[in-house]
A protein has these predicted regions:
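Short, intrinsically disordered, charge-balanced linker/junction segments flanking boundaries
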Residues: 1, 107-109
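A short, conserved alpha-helix in the catalytic core of glycosyltransferases
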Residues: 1-24
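Active-site-adjacent helix/loop segment of glycosyltransferases
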Residues: 16-106
Length: 109
């Protein structure tokens, strides 16, 4: 997510972000954590919320917060209905982390 955050911030500062469609990037995704890992779920949910809260002005973040939270609630219900308790707990844990670190995130804006 670091590269997403970097490019997002560059674009918000007025720089152009380009893509080279013919390029090939070899990326070892999920090497340290498998896709099925609840820890990976936790990190993905937490980090994507961090990007939302730190890369937009407060007014835009607030406007996007509720639709985003609603979608995450749907994901939580799906995990519960499919008995993926570790993933369900990871989603809730990411929310708790965000709520506990709002002051830190505000300073990162």
């Amino acid at each position: 997510m670091e590269e997403i955050d970097y490019h997002w911030k560059c674009q918000l500062m007025g720089h152009e972000v380009w893509v080279e469609p013919l390029s090939i990037i070899y990326h070892k995704g999920a090497v340290t954590l498998p896709v099925s890992s609840p820890k990976k779920t936790y990190l993905n949910y937490r980090n994507s919320f961090i990007l939302l809260l730190t890369n937009y002005r407060a007014s835009i973040s607030l406007r996007l917060f509720f639709p985003r939270f609603f979608m995450e609630c749907i994901s939580l219900v799906k995990e519960i209905l499919t008995f993926k308790w570790g993933h369900a707990f990871s989603i809730v844990r990411s929310w708790v982390w965000i709520m506990g670190h709002l002051g830190v995130l505000k300073k990162r804006r």
